């Protein structure tokens, strides 16, 4: 059992969310005696967050569930600069229109985890572009910039590692940590916010905000970071061989999302159940005791629970049933991901490599070729050995479909359109 007084820190500790806290006892006391407003920042660098950001969303979820007020800060302003933390090179700058489109797309996911509204602990979604776009540069340098030591900023690992490799760090990117620190102070002024959370790579940026707040007269501010997660085999969370595991349903189907979690390594099952589901800890402990083939039942529960939170219980159970029919009963379920191919194209024939790319099982013909040559590709459960193979309408089965498979667990139905 953890020694925390507050429900929030106790929950995070028991479930493995905590990496560092700036003032553990002070934050615990504050959370135990009053409703605390806390935030996590999200940069709109793509139309969707991916599964690597899910741990941050779950932290906001538990914050609200334990009686506090979560704020999801969208980086409409800082997104135009780009976070240089632990990046090897500068990010490409995005247009205002792209940022706005990405923010609108990302917002839809949060409603599945948080309750928004005007209540004391209802969630807020805020765009830092509201205040950053209107900053007077000279006033900002005088009032905020004077509190920052360049010597200290150069000592942060996020910057130091980049410079040690003799990689360029632009003045634009260097300003990112100042803007993020200012966000913390501005959010305190606007919403009485006291806590910023994030991944462990954000520790330096968050502590900068605490220091700036102290120098600018805010109440005591706090930092809490979560560990940067990798799988037991060292792979980054949110990535798979097929690409990013997006949270938006229009970028990754509920079935493919379910499959990602079903494929969790044995050594990660207990940890992921604690972090990504709301199952009681005693139930998680029971599932963690399963061994041998039974561990697969725990993986199915993990996949279904994580998918239910994001896509809804019906979509999660449909994905689980589709997988059961496909892998256990050998049936061809129409709930598998489906790609339409024009009838004329099928009649003329399409190369298997191009079909793999079209079905989004691979990103390039070269990748598809390697899978074919490695014996991982099947059409209607028959192995494909020739990368020059042409697939045409003759491959349609009695249901008018072609089943295209990569490995044992990735299947797409090709349907004439």
UniProtKB/Swiss-Prot annotation:
GO BP annotations, alphabetical order: tyrosyl-tRNA aminoacylation
Record-linked InterPro entries: aa-tRNA-synth_I_CS, aa-tRNA-synth_Ic, Rossmann-like_a/b/a_fold, S4_RNA-bd_sf, SYY-like_C, Tyr-tRNA-ligase, Tyr-tRNA-ligase_bac-type, Tyr-tRNA-ligase_bac_1
The keyword Nucleotide-binding is assigned to this record: yes
Motif placement: 'HIGH' region: 44-53
Sequence positions that bind ATP: 239
Binding site residues for L-tyrosine: 39, 176, 180
One term under GO cellular component: cytosol
PROSITE patterns, per database record: AA_TRNA_LIGASE_I (PS00178), S4 (PS50889)
MF terms (GO), sorted A to Z: ATP binding; RNA binding; tyrosine-tRNA ligase activity
Gene3D superfamilies: HUPs (3.40.50.620), RNA-binding S4 domain (3.10.290.10), Tyrosyl-Transfer RNA Synthetase (1.10.240.10)
Subunit-level organization: Homodimer.
HAMAP family registered for this protein in UniProt: Tyr_tRNA_synth_type1 (MF_02006)
Family stated for the protein in its record: Belongs to the class-I aminoacyl-tRNA synthetase family. TyrS type 1 subfamily.
Protein name: Tyrosine--tRNA ligase
The species this protein was found in: Brucella suis biovar 1 (strain 1330)
